[in-house]
A protein has these predicted regions:
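Generic preference for hydrophobic
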Residues: 18, 37-39, 54, 64-65, ...
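Flexible hinge/capping segments at coil-to-helix
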Residues: 51-92
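A late-sequence structural motif
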Residues: 73, 151-183
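Central regulatory/effector-binding core of bacterial HTH transcription factors
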Residues: 1-46, 117
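Active-site-adjacent beta-strand anchor residues
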Residues: 19-20, 89-90, 116, 134, ...
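Short beta-strand->loop
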Residues: 52-63, 146-160
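Hydrophobic hinge/microswitch elements
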Residues: 22-26, 31-34, 41, 95-151
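Residues at or immediately flanking beta-strands
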Residues: 13-17, 110-114, 162-164
């Protein structure tokens, strides 16, 4: 989310309030104007009773990372190495999870899932501690390999995570939301 919000963070006097919640609950709060925007991994469903609008922000390929100690456990090339180490995955609530599972099937991978996480930052923290290898978007690469010292296992261009800003207005009026949308 940080990458998506960067265009709005150069605003003087900015006060961000970022909340997490169930997708449907966030959309309901948005429709009631309790929120200015919802950042999501999927567009809002078509619902005549819910006046919200999805704006595509972009997409990013997934890359797989592991701690150096975990990577040392396997000499197999990517993606076969994923079968030889525990994995940490987004929970099934994340839209990308179904695409990851489909990719495992296409590659005939049967990995051991050591943990499932709603929060990608928490997932990366446990990955950094060596609990398992994990996917993250290419936007996180420099932070994960530089600041956190993780090793890149491989790039997975076949699995892409999509990002949307969902608003309660078709033509967004809020100036910070306009910045996020690149307007």
């Amino acid at each position: 989310a940080r990458h998506l919000l960067l265009p709005a963070t150069d605003t003087e006097g900015l006060h961000l309030l970022c909340s997490e919640g169930e997708f449907d609950d966030l959309l309901a709060d948005l429709a009631l104007h309790r929120l200015d925007v919802v950042l999501a991994d999927r567009p809002a469903p078509v619902n005549p009773n819910l006046k919200v609008y999805s704006h595509a922000l972009g997409e990013a390929a997934l890359m797989w990372y592991a701690s150096p100690a975990l990577r040392a456990l396997s000499d197999a090339a990517f993606p076969a190495c994923l079968d030889q180490m525990p994995l940490l995955l987004p929970s099934r609530h994340a839209a990308v999870r179904a695409r990851i599972d489909d990719w495992f099937d296409r590659k005939s991978l049967r990995p051991h899932v050591a943990g499932e996480f709603e929060d990608s930052a928490l997932l990366a923290t446990f990955g950094e501690s060596g609990l398992g290898a994990f996917p993250a978007t290419e936007w996180s690469h420099d932070e994960l390999t530089g600041q956190r010292g993780l090793q890149l296992l491989g790039r997975c261009d076949e699995v892409v995570e999509h990002f949307y800003a969902i608003s309660a207005e078709r033509r967004v009026q809020h100036p910070l939301v306009q910045k996020v949308l690149g307007q």
